[in-house]
Amino acid sequence: MSTPAVPQDLQLPPSQRAQSAFKEQRRQKLKEHLLRRKTLFAYKQENEVLSSRGQRVVTSEDQVQEGTKALKLKTKMADKENMKRPAESKNNTVVGKHCIPLKPSNELTNSTVVIDTHKPKDSNQTPHLLLTEDDPQSQHMTLSQAFHLKNNSKKKQMTTEKQKQDANMPKKPVLGSYRGQIVQSKINSFRKPLQVKDESSAATKKLSATIPKATKPQPVNTSNATVKSNRSSNMTATTKFVSTTSQNTQLVRPPIRSHHSNTQDTVKQGISRTSANVTIRKGPREKELLQSKTALSSVKTSSSQGIIRNKTLSRCIASEVVARPASLSNDKLTEKSEPVDQRRHTAGKASVDSRSAQPKETSEERKARLNEWKAGKGRVLKRPPNSVVTQHEPEGQNEKPVGSFWTTMAEEDEQRLFTEKVNNTFSECLNLINEGCPKGDILITLNDLIKNIPDAKKLVKYWICLALIEPITSPIENIIAIYEKAILAGAQPIEEMRHTIVDILTMKSQEKANLGENMEKSCASKEEVKEVSIEDTGVDVDPEKLEMESKHHRNLLFQDCEKEQDNKTKDPTHDVKTPNTETRTSCLIKYNVSTTPYLQSVKKKVQFDETNSAFKELKFLTPVRRSRRLQEKTSKLPDMLKDHYPCVSSLEQLTELGRETDAFVCRPNAALCRVYYEADTT
């Protein structure tokens, strides 16, 4: 096959083609052309995938027209390359050659395409034009080209999947936030001022931490790109980027030390300017974010030597950019970058001043702040803390006026005289009780004392006097009621009251026992006197006459008993005398007060018939016989074991049991009459 003839426009003069410099130049340009072609091939595949979803199909006529345009553009580029250049151009191309990797990755290839363009107009047109140039060749692919195409497509799929995963990754949480709210205590925990001992180590760590955060893309490639690229295109891109970075700098944490701010600002300025050319010209914002994330991952994996080299290069580039002659776009850049730097300085100074001026909070303030935070969250303590109680105690103490020594002494003297007076009155009452003074006089003195001094009820002696006033014949319930009232009033000391009540109860039991013994002795003495009188007379009496007389006497007693019962049914008020004298000494005849359901029904009938009834209660009154010995023992039993129906020894005690409006129905006791009848038969 014969090689195609070279057009005359592209041929060099024969005198220049033989030179070694031009041969080296052609070899270098051929390498650059092949590399550009490979990168544009991958870019074309990506554009084909995107255009297949909605773009139009390029016809054959359009391809021919675009091919002619590409040839014309190629001739123009060749003419420009043959023009004379300054000596520094070769060095720049060498640096670009070393910096650009041969891997066909999307990020670096796209960046090289954008960087190597010289005019803003051509930068938008070159990708489409060069892609159309390769279209006729793509129809006849060799095996190596097909292999490279497959590898590039696989790599593109991997990169797109990674980019999607990075986009789906959750965002980094805001520092100091807890459940959607920013907590001041969490911010203070990682922004407290460091101690003097750890200043050097902390400063080095923070410098190394802030530099990789700021350098998102690789600075070596972009720095060479800024030197090679045209000034007008670079300055327009950087002016756009400063407006975006000024918003992002507000989110970055302010510098911790003021003396590091100058160096950090210069480094950040250079890095932001160099990284602007890569990120802004890419196209949509989504690609910018993806490229910045991939660049961050590459920067984190780099070694410490690479970081130091990047720092030095960025500083040199920053100094060169500042030293360049000022143009219109450069003036705009400096005007926009200066307020950003001023904001950084002011934010850093304000943060340092606020930390230095902020005093160390006390434990009480911290607790109060914690309580406020808990109240805001809806967490309230069930029991109030002890600190609240301790704060109120001194206030109450301060409210009480502190009296002088003499006033307190006078108050103590008055209190002592007061207690002595009360004790004297109680002792006088006790003496009167022991002497046998009437109950009414002692009650008058006690009531007068309580009227004048109501607090005297809290003394036990008052209740002791009331218990001793009660006669020995009074029931035990009255004394127990006095004891209960003393407990309710809070009398002190209650032990003394308990001892006195025990003494009173023992006295009552002894009195009852003595009375029973005296009655038995008197009865026994009477019987002995009768026996002695019968023996002394010595008169012979017929036993038959004695039996007849005794029978006659018993019959009379039985008749009298029946008459008495009849009289009781007719008019119970006539029976005033107690039947104790008519019975023997070992037994007692008492009246039992009880009710029955039948009696209650009768009462309801009577009340229904007579609306204006004079009585309210209706009870039975039955004479019963009780043993004297058992009666004495049952009196000592508690109320639960005693007989529920009370027994009365006389009619006078009925007024104490019931009301005046109560009515009693007397019914005879056949058992008492039967006793007399049995005695008669024997």
Swiss-Prot record:
Q: Which domain of life is it from?
A: Eukaryota
Q: Which residues carry this modification: Phosphoserine?
A: 177, 189, 533, 594, 601
- Task of the protein: Possesses microtubule stabilizing properties. Involved in regulating aneuploidy, cell cycling, and cell death in a p53/TP53-dependent manner.
**Comp. bias regions, Polar residues:** 218-251, 261-278, 291-305
Keywords, A to Z, come to: Apoptosis, Cell cycle, Cytoplasm, Cytoskeleton, Microtubule, Phosphoprotein
GO cellular component terms, A-Z = cytoplasm; microtubule
Quaternary form?
Answer: Associates with alpha- and beta-tubulins.
Q: Does the keyword Thylakoid apply?
A: no
Please give the name of this protein. Cytoskeleton-associated protein 2
Q: Phosphotyrosine modification sites? A: 598
Residue ranges, annotated region (Disordered): 1-28, 152-174, 208-305, 326-402, 557-581
GO annotation (BP), single: apoptotic process
By sequence similarity, the record places it as follows: Belongs to the CKAP2 family.
Return the Basic and acidic residues bias intervals.
332-344, 361-375, 560-577
| Positions of post-translational Phosphothreonine modification | 578, 581, 595-596
Membrane-spanning intervals of the chain: none
What main location does UniProt list? cytoplasm
Q: Which InterPro entries match?
A: CKAP2_C, CKAP2_fam
Cellular localization per UniProt: Cytoplasm, Cytoskeleton
- Give the organism the record lists: Pongo abelii
Whether Membrane counts among this entry's keywords is: no
